C-alpha cells in the first residue's frame, strides 16, 4: 500500500505553524510497511483542495488529510471530501454527545456552530476524538482506495491516529514492516560521503541507503522492509559492514544520538573527568556537557578567558608564548589546556582558541581554530582547523570537532570501535 499525506490549513502556508503532523504520520505508516510517496499542503480553499485531492487520489491507495474539520466557515475538508466521494453529510448522534460532553467537562458554553462538527460523511467509519471535538473519518471507496480525515491539532490527531485509525489500517496492509537504522558521521562532508558510497547507494534496494545532512554532521538512514526482525537485523548488519569498510572512521553513533551524548556516556562509563578552557567558544563546550543529568560527576569546571590577561592569570599561559606565538596559536591552546587541567585537577582537559570572524586576527583568517586535548597518561594532542561559515557556525563546529576528537581518543583508550 502507498499513501499520500495532505495537510489542510492556510496557517501552514503562511508559516504561522509547522506541519509536525506529517512527520508523525509518516513514521507511523513506515512502521507498518506503508510507503509514503508525497506530502502536500493546501490552504483553506475549496477549489484548490478539490484539485489536490483528485491528484492524490489518482496516485495513492490511501490519502490521509489533516485539518479543516472544525466548526468555522473556513473548515472545508469534510464538505469537500463528501462531494468528491458523491456522499451526503449526515448527523451523527454519538459525535454530538461527545462534543456536548467535551464542553461540559471544560465548563464552556457550546455555540451553535459547534454542531457542525457532528456531521460525518455518509457510509464512513467514524473515528472517535477522545481529546477534542471533531471526529475523524475513514472512507473506503468502491475501488478499494481509502480516504482518512483527521483533526489538525497534534494533541487530537496523534491519539486518534494511533488508537482509532492505525488498527484499521493494519488489517489492510501486507504483513511487512519497515525498520530503519540511522548511522551518524562527523568529519566528512555530505558530498564526500555520497561519493565514497555512490555505488552502494545506487544499487541497494533492501535496505535502501539515504544520506541526510544537518548541523554540520551527516547521517545515513538504512531502511529495510521485512516480515521477520532477525532477517531485518541481518540485512542491516550486512549493509553497515560494507559502509564501515569505506567510511567507518567517521562513524560515531546510531539512531537518536549526538556527539555530546556519546562523549558524555563514554566519560561517565570510564569514570574520567574533564575541564575546558575556552576563548573562541566562550563556554559552549562545557554548556553542552552540563545539559546532561549527572554532568557534575564528569565536568570538573570551565574557564572562559577571552583576554590575554585572564589567560595568564587563570590558565598560566606565559607572556613569552603570547608575545612570540600569539593568543591564536597551537602553543597558546596547549598552555590553556595544561592550565585548566592543573586548576581543576581533571583527568582530561580541552581548550579552544581561534578566529570566529568576520575579520582577520593576528594574521589568521576567520574560521582558524586551534584545539588542544590533554589525555590520561600524559598524551597531548593539538589540532588545527579551518572552518567555514559565520561566527556562530564556526564556534559551534569547533565544539563539535572537540567532542569528535575526544570521543575518538576515548574509544582508542578503551580498545573499542
UniProtKB/Swiss-Prot annotation:
InterPro entries: CinA, CinA-like_C, CinA_C, CinA_KH, Competence-induced_CinA, MoaB/Mog-like_dom_sf, MoaB/Mog_dom. It holds the Pfam family CinA_KH. Gene3D superfamilies: 3.30.70.2860, CinA-like (3.90.950.20), MoaB/Mog-like domain (3.40.980.10). It comes from the Bacteria. Belongs to the CinA family. This is Putative competence-damage inducible protein. The gene is cinA.
Amino acid at each position: 500500500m502507498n499513501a499520500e499525506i495532505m495537510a489542510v490549513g492556510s496557517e501552514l502556508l503562511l508559516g504561522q505553524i509547522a506541519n509536525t503532523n506529517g512527520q508523525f504520520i509518516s513514521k507511523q505508516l513506515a512502521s507498518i510497511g506503508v510507503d509514503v510517496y508525497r506530502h502536500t499542503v493546501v490552504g483553506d480553499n475549496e477549489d484548490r483542495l478539490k484539485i489536490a485531492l483528485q491528484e492524490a487520489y489518482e496516485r495513492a491507495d490511501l490519502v490521509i488529510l489533516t485539518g479543516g474539520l472544525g466548526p468555522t466557515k473556513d473548515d472545508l475538508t469534510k464538505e469537500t471530501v463528501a462531494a468528491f466521494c458523491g456522499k451526503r453529510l449526515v448527523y451523527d448522534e454519538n459525535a454530538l454527545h461527545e462534543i456536548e460532553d467535551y464542553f461540559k467537562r471544560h465548563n464552556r458554553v457550546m455555540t451553535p456552530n459547534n454542531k457542525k462538527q457532528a456531521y460525518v460523511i455518509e457510509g464512513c467509519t467514524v473515528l472517535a476524538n477522545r481529546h477534542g471535538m471533531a471526529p475523524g473519518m475513514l472512507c473506503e471507496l468502491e475501488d478499494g482506495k481509502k480516504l482518512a480525515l483527521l483533526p489538525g491539532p497534534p494533541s487530537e490527531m496523534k491519539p486518534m491516529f494511533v488508537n482509532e485509525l492505525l488498527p484499521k489500517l493494519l488489517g489492510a496492509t501486507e504483513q511487512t514492516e519497515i525498520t530503519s537504522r540511522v548511522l551518524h558521521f562527523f568529519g566528512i562532508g555530505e558530498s564526500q560521503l555520497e561519493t565514497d558510497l555512490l555505488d552502494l547507494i545506487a544499487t541497494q534496494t533492501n535496505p535502501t541507503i539515504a544520506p541526510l545532512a544537518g548541523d554540520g554532521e551527516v547521517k545515513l538512514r538504512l531502511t529495510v522492509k521485512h516480515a521477520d526482525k532477525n532477517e531485518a537485523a541481518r540485512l542491516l548488519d550486512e549493509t553497515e559492514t560494507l559502509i564501515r569498510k569505506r567510511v567507518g572512521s567517521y562513524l560515531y553513533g546510531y539512531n537518536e544520538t549526538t556527539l555530546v551524548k556519546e562523549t558524555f556516556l563514554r566519560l561517565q562509563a570510564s569514570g574520567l573527568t574533564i575541564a575546558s578552557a575556552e576563548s573562541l567558544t566562550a563556554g559552549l563546550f562545557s554548556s553542552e556537557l552540563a545539559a546532561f543529568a549527572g554532568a557534575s560527576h564528569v565536568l570538573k569546571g570551565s574557564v572562559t578567558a577571552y583576554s590575554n590577561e585572564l589567560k595568564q592569570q587563570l590558565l598560566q599561559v606565559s607572556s613569552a608564548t603570547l608575545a612570540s606565538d600569539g593568543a591564536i596559536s597551537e602553543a597558546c591552546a596547549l598552555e590553556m589546556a595544561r592550565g585548566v587541567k592543573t586548576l581543576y585537577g581533571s583527568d582530561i582537559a580541552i581548550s579552544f582558541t581561534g578566529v570566529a570572524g568576520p575579520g582577520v586576527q593576528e594574521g589568521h583568517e576567520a574560521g582558524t581554530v586551534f584545539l588542544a586535548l590533554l589525555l590520561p597518561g600524559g598524551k597531548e594532542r593539538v589540532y588545527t582547523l579551518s572552518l567555514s561559515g559565520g561566527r556562530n557556525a564556526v564556534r559551534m563546529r569547533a565544539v563539535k570537532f572537540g567532542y569528535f576528537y575526544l570521543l575518538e581518543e576515548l574509544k582508542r583508550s578503551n580498545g573499542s570501535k
